[in-house]
Amino acid sequence: MAVKFHLCLLLIILVGMGAHVAFADLPLCDYPYGACFYRADPCPDDMPVECPNYFYCPQQTDRCCCYE
């Protein structure tokens, strides 16, 4: 039973690390570049550029809006 638990825990850790590695090449969407906003909301007027190809947001429901 303990072996199954440890294997399951290892699988969860590896999947979590794999999801993080997918974004490792992109920097975090944060000041001074921009900020993360909910996908359904428009980007604010002072950050009108949507830039998901250059920065990533930790929440999958968010997108990155950048300064001009």
Swiss-Prot record:
Modification after translation, per record: Contains 4 disulfide bonds.
Chief location category: secreted
Name of the protein this chain belongs to: Small cysteine-rich protein 5
Keyword flag Nucleotide-binding: no
Compartments (UniProt record): Secreted; Nematocyst
Role this protein plays: Induces neurotoxic symptoms on zebrafish. Has also been claimed to be implied in calcification, but tests on homolog proteins suggest that proteins of this family have a neurotoxic function and not a calcification function.
Keyword field: Disulfide bond, Nematocyst, Neurotoxin, Secreted, Signal, Toxin
The family this protein is said to belong to: Belongs to the Cnidaria small cysteine-rich protein (SCRiP) family. gamma subfamily.
Transmembrane segments: none
Signal peptide: 1-24
Keyword Secreted: yes
Gene Ontology molecular functions: toxin activity
